Amino acid sequence: MSEHVRDALATIVDGGTLGLDEARVVMGEVMDGGATPAQLAALLMGLRMRGETVDELAGFALAMRERVVRVDAPAGAIDLVGTGGDGSGTFNISTASALVVAAAGVPVAKHGNRAITSKSGSADVLDALGIRIDHDAVSASASLRDTGFAFLFAPNFHPAMRHAGPTRREIGVRTAFNLLGPLTNPAGTTRQVLGVGDARAAGRFAEVVHRLGTERTFVIHGDGVDELPLDDSGMLYHVGPDGIEQQRVLASALGLTMTTTARLAGGTAAENARAIEGVLHGEPGARRDVVLLNAAAGLLVAGAVDDLEGGIERAALTIDAGLGNALLARLRAERRSADVEAADVETAASAVEGAPA
């Protein structure tokens, strides 16, 4: 049992908040296995019901960053990631957008996990697409160098999360960890597109990013979704060293067809994988348009284009030139090669075990 966590719980119950340093220590206790499941559940739900403060989230993120397994990434690598837990049921838009951005020539270190509160997390859909999700630091760095894309499966790079994972799954609702994942990319990306589904949290999240420091980050939000939507409810917070600026994003003004979030509904990982394949194959419609919009944000935050209009055009050209499909083929080949290598190692190990003494 952690005394620090117990003291933090008393503070929260009394209506108080944790300072940055206090939050850093508390999350360190959690990550190091010092908190009991009951303490962790109480902490997460107390914060969820009250709302996490900027200092609390920044302190938690710093503790997690101190314990992450680092990945060497090319200069200019970015991440596109949502906090999840928005309940919208859309297909994996940020994952599809990340593939398009990588296909356009911007390295993407995609940090994510399996589904906690939805049917399909980024790991689930990439696995269904035949893309490798079991990278370690060495293979992830190699994939970023060779293909321009690597998926960083959170449990592989945040081993300390094993102490929190079971409790998080049992709770089954959005917690502070949904917000912390995007803030703790193992590649240390300083340019990111971070999606937040909760309108009340989006501005606060931008403040957290600014507090932690960033070269350039976009915090994006739509009506109930953690992506830029097609219903003209999009909001984008530009976060940089000098502060935060807020911008409305109107899909209709960018030449995209307005539609409701319901038309972007997803399903299982297999169903969402087919939806992403359709986008990469160039199928027209709402799914393509929402991927173009969110990929445009990624290209803009990377400095590859000058504005969202240019990003939409670049993303469309990337898809229509077959570059998205080509990247998918390379990533699938990488997965097959890794699977063969793993099978060979297992066979060799079995042979050694079965050899006579």
Predicted segments, located by residue:
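A glycine-rich phosphate/pyrophosphate-binding beta-strand-loop-alpha-helix module
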Residues: 44, 91-147
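Acidic, glycine-rich active-site loops and adjacent beta-strand->loop/helix elements
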Residues: 82-87, 112-118, 157, 223-225
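Active-site cofactor/substrate anionic-group-binding motifs, chiefly glycine-
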Residues: 51-112
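N-terminal small/glycine-rich loop or linker at the start of catalytic domains
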Residues: 2-14, 79-83, 109
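Glycine-rich anion-binding loops and their surrounding alpha/beta cores
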Residues: 3-4, 11, 18, 66-69, ...
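Short glycine-rich or small-residue beta-strand-to-loop segments that form or flank ligand, phosphate
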Residues: 13, 44-48, 79-84, 298-301
